[in-house]
Amino acid sequence: MNNLFSTTKELISREEKEKLISQKGLCIWLTGLSGSGKTTIAKNVSYELHRKGYLTQVLDGDNIRLGINKNLSFNIEDRLENVRRTAEIAKLFIQNGIITICCLVSPTEEIRGLAKKIIGQKDFFEVFIDTSIEECEKR
């Protein structure tokens, strides 16, 4: 017996949730090389937004891989699955009005496109952290 159900309409709409906390949910997707500063930037952006009264959630790729994605490797299929799971989690936060900052290497356009498709174009803001490979290697 299949106990999975399609997504049902919530009793409280996204708009009502956003109104309650006086903000719109969205995703800031930070991408870049390992060691480029994604996590540091995400934490600082989250801190500054919090100081201004905004509710945020940081989804850090390293932390996600220590928990829900600990069974994944770094081959292309598992990288896609890592991003898929993270984007699905981000979408849940966004639908509740939370500004969600994701920081994942997400090295290919295909991988980032998957995240954008799951989250939705209007809620997805991609930021490439352009740090030289030499600087990343130092960190």
Regions found by a protein language model. Name each.
Residues 137-139:
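GTPase G-domain guanine-specificity segment
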Residues 1-103, 107-125, 130-135:
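Glycine-rich phosphate-binding loop of ATP-dependent small-molecule kinases
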